[in-house]
Amino acid sequence: MLPLRAVSQVAGMNNLSVLDMTASARAAGLGMDYLPIADGDLSIAVDNPSMFMPSMHNAITFSYVGMFSHVGMGQVSYARDFGRPGVFAATMKYHNYGLFDGYDEYDNSTGRFYACDVTAILSWGFKIDSSFSFGVSAKPTFSQYASYTALAIAFDMSASYVHPNRRFVATVIGRNVGAQFFFGQAKTDWTPFEISAALSYKLSKAPFRFFLAITELQQWNLMYEDMYNPSQTTDPFTGEVTKRSGVAKFFDNAGRHVLAGVELNIGKVVFLRFGYNFRQMREMQASSGFNTSGFSYGLGLRIKGFEFSYARNNYHLLQAPNYFTLSTNLERFMKKR
């Protein structure tokens, strides 16, 4: 149901991938889910709660992701600063997987059914001092696939350091601490827990900000093991038998932990973004040859208090999700009254 995600846990070996999927076009353009950047972007703070700041008071953001075929995701977020207690935010995220034709084990039609996930995110961010901040998000998620329903409750926690000049930002984040409960079944699954770290650095005399993330610190081996080809020495498309050295496997595995991106700021109005995810490329490639899976790019425009972002993240050779985000601050409208 969810083959789109290739970042949390070993591919094909976890449930609730929906908890990891960002709706932020800015984050998607840079190839990351949690950006370490302190510039008041609410869409970023939803995924990295330690990035909430007082300047987000009355900020609101809308996002839509057009995925494959009829699959889509929408998100709306609102934040409010309460002074010393910190910044609180509420987010609603909806994943629609479309309408399906149902059949039983005898190939008899059982009618049509919908599949969807709905997540309500409640977030809190607090500045410890001028440089350090902390945040936490609660993410209850209701899932319904035909007659199957489940409820997951997961938490994200992050801590960030922001240099006084704001050119250097670092974040450590723990995501998806929780469990999923299935209605009508005596079954409980753990949500896909992840510990990651990320940093960004803006050059002092050039309009570039670089991003780097080290993901899945709780698990070294991120290579997918095919039960029908456990040694992974046979290409499933060409049938070619290959053998890799231990050194090659080490660097392959190490590369799967690394995400990289760069943002170009043109006159504080236009933003160009590029990202690369080696693991996504390795898991989604159709053959041993080069392909664009794992590459992402995006565009941002900031005009008269509104910020629009678009991104495209290449998960597959033929299709890729398109991300759209519109952000503003309601304060600018209130002041005009």
Identify the role of each PLM range:
Residues 7-337:
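Subset of outer-membrane beta-barrel
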